[in-house]
Curated annotation (Swiss-Prot):
The keyword DNA-binding applies. It is found in: Cytoplasm. It comes from Pelagibacter ubique (strain HTCC1062). Belongs to the TACO1 family. Residues 1-24 are annotated as: Disordered. GO terms for molecular function: DNA binding. It comes from the Bacteria. GO terms for cellular component: cytoplasm. This is Probable transcriptional regulatory protein SAR11_0592.
Length: 241
């Protein structure tokens, strides 16, 4: 659960602070349980579950927690979760997309709307903000796995559109429909991945006035802290602040 390096899409990393670890594990466990419930409990046969487990391992979630989350999918068979998306605009009119996984959409909608209103922003309708983004398949690989030169060539050969490297990881971009095919090709050479996710990538990032950056950050962090919210994306650009 991390940010998009090139376009400054905000998808804040969870779990870096000890005080957030419990909340992070709770959200990861929910995703694992839902993925296991909706598909095969064998990660090899369930791409969503495989990605959820990969994210959990990247967050240093204990193996026992992962196994309990998978087992929980059978115990809580009567609990139905929905994937929901909310769109709107926050401080300084930054475009925001919120992805949630909830068993009570009325509660989640009320909470998300309240956060938008308190920030001085507004929650819009479907499509009101998402036209500012593209959905892409994003595969992240630790720099220790492979060099910049090697990963670029491998990514293109594997069917990716682009590969961007920074100080920490390689980010491979591809059409969302091709993400698992691209990863399957990469797995012939690479064993360990940081994450494999569909992300909302801004078409253009926008600058926020310096005196509003703190408010924008607080708004995004408050959204992400909601128990039902899994991911938060924005087109805000922090590089010039």
């Amino acid at each position: 659960m991390s940010g998009h390096s090139k376009w400054a899409s905000i998808k804040h990393s969870k779990g870096k602070a000890d005080k957030q670890r419990s909340k992070v594990f709770s959200k990861l466990s929910k995703e694992i349980s839902v993925a296991a419930k909706l598909g095969d409990k064998d990660p090899a046969m369930n791409p969503r579950l495989r990605s959820a487990i990969q994210a959990a391992k990247s967050a240093n979630m204990p193996k026992d927690n992962i196994e309990r989350a998978i087992a929980k999918s059978s115990v809580n068979s009567e609990t139905n979760y929905e994937n929901l998306r909310y769109e709107g605009f926050g401080p300084d009119k930054i475009a925001v997309i919120v992805e949630a996984l909830t068993d009570n959409k009325n509660r989640t909608a009320s909470n998300v709307r309240s956060i938008f209103v308190k920030s001085g922003g507004n929650l819009g309708t479907q499509g009101s903000a998402s036209h500012n983004f593209n959905q892409l398949g994003i595969i992240k690989i630790d720099k220790k796995e492979i060099s910049d030169e090697q990963i670029f060539e491998l990514a293109i050969e594997s069917g990716a559109d682009e590969c961007i490297s920074n100080d920490e990881f390689h980010e491979i971009q591809c059409p969302m429909s091709e993400i698992y095919n691209v990863k399957k090709n990469l797995e012939k050479t690479i064993a360990n991945f940081i994450s494999t996710e569909i992300e909302w990538v801004p078409l253009n990032s926008v600058d926020v006035e310096k005196d509003k950056v703190e408010a924008a950050l607080e708004f995004l962090e408050t959204l992400e802290d909601d128990d039902d919210v899994q991911s938060v994306y924005s087109n805000i650009n922090f590089k010039n602040n």
